Structures are given as structure tokens and as C-alpha cells.
Amino acid sequence: MDKLFLEIVTPEGEIFANDVKSVQVPGCEGEFGILPRHATLVTTLNAGVIEVINLDGTKDMIAIDDGGCIKVAEDKTTILANGAVYIGGSNESEIAISLQKAKELVKSMSSNTIVYATTIAKIDEQVRQK
């Protein structure tokens, strides 16, 4: 099975590090997807939601603020973000807390109202699916 190692890091530490099937990120020129053996690239990221498809088919989401960057190599992708919040948890209380933190992060860092509205809609959709 093809897999890609994804690492998401902030100044506070590592947010995510695992082998995944694919990842979709909010690039500076629009959203794009990354699969194993992707062409090498380095680019900046907008505020938004990173969607991760794990090896077992489950989906994780991480909200990031503006100004991050991504380095994609054939078998490893590294995302550096000023701020990031994992959206999820093992119970409704944890999910509600992470949802609120994600919304606050995106609201405080994005001056673009379209990016903000789109990101909040994606976050809300993920919570409804859990």
C-alpha cells in the first residue's frame, strides 16, 4: 500500500505525525491534494483546514492560520504553521472544545472573510460527520 508520511509542526510543537493515504491543503493558489509519490514542491499556505485521509480510511482535520508553508517530497510532507488546532476528540465535550479553538484560531488570523466563512463551514461539516 502506498503511504505518505505527514508531519504538521507549530512553534509550540508537533500537531500531527503519521503515515497517511492523502492530504488536502489550503494552498496560496487554492486547495490541492497530495498523494504518495507527489512531485516535489514548496509553497505557502492560507488559513484553512487540512484534510487528512488516514491509512485506515478515517478522516482527520486540522485548522491552520495564515502564513504557513509546506514542503512536499516523494514520500514525506512537512507543514510548518504559526498556529494549528487538531479538530476532534474521543467525546462530544473534547470535540466541542477543539471546534471552538479552531474557530478562534481561524478568526484571529484570517482577514479574508471568504476564507474564514469557507473554513468555518468545513469545520462545522466535520463535526456533524463525527
UniProtKB/Swiss-Prot annotation:
Membrane topology: Peripheral membrane protein
GO-annotated molecular function: ATP binding; proton-transporting ATP synthase activity, rotational mechanism
Places the protein is found: Cell inner membrane
Gene Ontology CC terms: plasma membrane; proton-transporting ATP synthase complex
Keywords: ATP synthesis, Cell inner membrane, Cell membrane, CF(1), Hydrogen ion transport, Ion transport, Membrane, Transport
Species assigned in the record: Campylobacter hominis (strain ATCC BAA-381 / DSM 21671 / CCUG 45161 / LMG 19568 / NCTC 13146 / CH001A)
The protein, known as: ATP synthase epsilon chain
Keyword set includes DNA repair: no
Subunit structure, interactors included: F-type ATPases have 2 components, CF(1) - the catalytic core - and CF(0) - the membrane proton channel. CF(1) has five subunits: alpha(3), beta(3), gamma(1), delta(1), epsilon(1). CF(0) has three main subunits: a, b and c.
Membrane listed as a keyword: yes
Ranges that cross the membrane: none
